[in-house]
Regions:
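Acidic, glycine-rich flexible loop segments
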Residues: 32-73
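Conserved small-residue
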Residues: 214, 423, 440-535, 566, ...
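Extracytoplasmic gating/loop element in the C-terminal half of outer-membrane beta-barrel translocons
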Residues: 129-151, 561-661
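Surface-exposed beta-strand-turn/loop segments characteristic
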Residues: 1, 47, 51-52, 60-67, ...
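Extracellular/periplasmic, surface-exposed regions of secreted and cell-surface proteins
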Residues: 3-10, 15-20, 24-29, 67-123, ...
Length: 707
């Protein structure tokens, strides 16, 4: 609400909003990268999309099969292994404006915001995950089940369950309270109808207090009145693994900034403006040297259409302006990097034996006195054009950016007591072009047609990078970066064909051809990796058309993306079960000697091959991350099609309404184009299991009534 006090000199604006959301999602654990086996796995993954994609179509959807040594049915598991999410958000804001004179205005704004979210993971008694922790029907299962407890104090005893009854209840809560205050003063004046001067000053401070808690309740009996049932050996096992069954984390973020801007325009033709900002934060640690940083921006605009020589160009040209800006901006970097002074954290050292326990303090990150903000210089040139009384408008921007002091991990000689340190270790340059074209193609009384076209091209290169990581990080997920390649580049192992047995072979780091001598945890020699391309597109944009005829409005909106690569789903393995779906690539697999000359799809490894060839799993993991398992990420997508009808006023008035409309909308209905090598895989979706699903097709019918 807005209330005017003292006529128009004093204005009070009050805003309040609140939201609450409940959601239920499939139960999910965190994914893990195995650098030895070369796999990315997630235990007890019941993601419906992943299950539908990778499960055999011969399975009866109502039957139970064996998984994790215990009965499993996807529909039953989804009903007994789920997460309840609750999110609430409340914000109140008040702004007071005082117009001291017609040219000077001061304002003060205060806001408080509270956010709270909770995630409750319910793993019920009869769920597959809970039963896996007590499955020991036979001695073979008992010795092979990884979820049973092998008591180190009783070496002659068989493994046994630490969850003899009940299920598992996991809860995590996150709360954040932020307080913001901003005071500003502005001065606006015009001299002789030619000189326009705007001055603006601002002071702002904000504080954010965050609290995160987590808890794991083992043995909660969902089928017995939700009564806990746990045994002593559960805590013994957690102590031996140094596992914390509850946690509490508080963080306090404080920020302050002082800024001033000026803008001067002469005769509506030439405009220059600048900004100077001095901000500070405690995000980088307690050191005052890393706390404050000045940033600035200077820009100019030449409105060519206001020049006298432009008049003969009308009406073909209706507007023309040239823009130029140069700036220094900064970012505080990752939230976990705060070692401008040494960071000391408490911990419980692992001692193995449960009777030996002690708290301790550890230097988690040694001091980096030179730690500072991540910075960026940007030069931007823009051109705005209008034709035929602005029926056609074109806006173009070209930019060049130099990022420096980027924060990352650097490997040192360890003289300071730590090998890995966080610091400003990287630099990157980028350039790009952005274009926006709007046209009013047809404008008649009963029919209108408008088109909006957006095009963006971007290219970047990491020019300096002092860091090291494992080979598995370069070839999985969203890739990694090397000097001379774009940020977020995808690499692959070089596939060298199938051998005479149908086993895939690759180029090893020493230059030899191998099937199993691939070290996924290698951090130094990456000469056997092939650069595939960036995981982020270099060309993006959209094309939208709006047609209006009488009361009907048709909107057709498409998006496109080109220039990136995607990793195909890692579906190959040295062993499969009857529960696994066979993808269509298997129709072209190696079957008989000599097939290695006609196909790149490896053989389904036999039991004998698994016994005779040690570490055969490495060959199939490497094949999943080889250059033959990469496709282009290019696509053109029909993003939205909608048809709406606004009923005439005569109809709505008869119904005692001020307005009545009906709208049908289809969102993400289909892909117009994508790489055939994807074979139906969504180029915008990276399947990580858990709760990840591709963008769904949505069809919405909306009736809008106003009174």
């Amino acid at each position: 609400t807005t209330q005017h006090i003292l006529k128009d000199k004093l204005t009070l604006n009050l805003i309040g909003n609140a939201s609450y959301r409940e959601q239920r999602a499939p139960g999910s654990l965190s994914s893990e990268v195995d650098p030895v086996f070369g796999t990315v796995k997630r235990d007890f993954d019941i993601n419906p999309y992943s299950y539908a994609l990778r499960s055999s179509r011969t399975l009866d959807p109502d039957e139970f099969y064996t998984r994790n040594y215990t009965p499993f049915n996807i529909k039953d598991e989804l009903s007994k292994n789920y997460m309840d999410l609750n999110v609430s958000d409340v914000k109140f804001q008040a702004e007071l404006k005082w117009k001291i004179t017609p040219k000077v205005e001061v304002s003060a704004l205060g806001a408080i915001k509270y956010q709270a979210s909770s995630t409750e993971h319910h793993i019920e008694d009869s769920s597959n995950q809970a039963q896996a922790y007590r499955s020991m029907a036979t001695s073979i299962i008992q010795s092979n089940n990884p979820y049973l407890y092998d008591n180190p104090d009783e070496p002659n005893r068989d493994k046994y369950s630490i969850l003899p009854q009940g299920g598992i209840y996991k809860r995590s809560d996150f709360r954040a309270k932020s307080r913001d205050f901003r005071a500003s003063i502005s001065y606006n004046d015009t001299f002789n109808d030619k000189h326009i001067l705007n001055l603006f000053g601002i002071v702002e401070v904000n504080a954010i207090d965050r609290r995160a808690t987590s808890f794991q309740g083992w043995g909660l009996q969902y089928d017995m009145g939700e009564t806990p049932f746990y045994i002593l050996d559960l805590f013994k096992k957690q102590l031996e693994e140094n596992t914390q069954y509850y946690s509490l984390s508080n963080t306090r973020e404080r920020n302050a900034a002082f800024a001033g801007t000026f803008s001067y325009s002469y005769d509506y033709r030439y405009t220059i403006n600048g900004t100077l900002r001095y901000e500070g934060s405690n995000r980088l640690g307690r050191s005052r040297k890393a706390r404050w940083l000045p940033t600035w921006n200077i820009a100019g605009k030449w409105s060519i259409d206001q020049e006298s020589f432009f008049e003969p160009l009308r009406p073909a040209f209706s507007s023309l302006a040239l823009r130029l800006s140069y700036s220094l901006t900064a970012d505080r970097g990752p939230t976990w990097v705060n070692n401008s002074t040494a960071t000391i954290y408490p911990l419980n050292p692992w001692r193995g034996a449960t009777e030996i326990r002690e708290p301790a303090l550890s230097i988690s990150a040694p001091e980096n006195s030179e730690l500072t903000y991540e910075k960026k210089h940007e030069l931007n040139v823009g051109l705005d054009m209008g034709f035929l009384d602005d029926r056609i408008t074109l806006s173009m921007d070209a930019y060049r950016r130099n990022n420096f002091d980027l924060i990352g991990n650097v490997v040192t000689m360890g003289l300071g007591g730590a090998v890995d340190k966080q610091g400003n270790v990287a630099e990157m340059k980028s350039q790009g072009v952005e274009l926006s074209l709007f046209t009013r193609n047809i404008e008649r009384k009963d029919f209108k047609w408008q088109t909006n076209f957006i095009f963006a091209w971007m290219d970047n290169e990491v020019t300096k990078l002092k860091t090291m990581t494992r080979m598995i990080d370069y070839i999985t997920g969203t890739g990694y970066s090397m000097e001379g390649t774009p940020r977020g580049s995808l690499f692959s192992l070089k596939f060298k064909g199938l051998n005479e047995m149908g086993i895939p072979t690759f180029l090893a780091a020493d230059g030899s051809i191998t099937s199993t001598n691939i070290q996924f945890q290698e951090t130094v020699n990456m000469s056997n990796l092939v650069y595939e391309g960036p995981v982020d597109p270099t060309i993006t944009g959209s094309l939208g058309n709006i047609f209006k005829w009488k009361g009907f409005t048709l909107n057709v909106f498409m998006t496109y993306s080109f220039g990136n690569v995607v990793r195909l789903d890692p579906i190959f393995s040295n062993g499969y079960s009857d529960l696994t779906a066979m993808p269509r690539e298997f129709a072209n697999r190696y079957l008989n000697p000599g097939d290695e000359r006609r196909t790149n799809v490896p053989v389904i490894a036999s039991t004998r091959q698994n016994n005779d060839i040690s570490n055969l799993y490495v060959a199939y993991s490497a094949y999943n991350y080889s250059d033959v398992r990469v496709a282009k990420g290019d696509f053109i997508r029909m993003k939205e099609i909608s048809l709406s009808y606004d009923f005439p006023q005569s109809v709505s008035s008869k119904l005692r309404m001020s307005g009545l409309s009906l709208k049908f909308q289809a969102t993400n209905p289909f892909l117009i184009y994508s790489d055939k090598k994807l074979q139906g895989q969504d180029p915008e979706f990276f399947n990580t299991g858990g709760v990840a699903v591709p963008m769904p097709k949505q069809f919405t019918l909306t009736l809008r009534v106003s009174f």
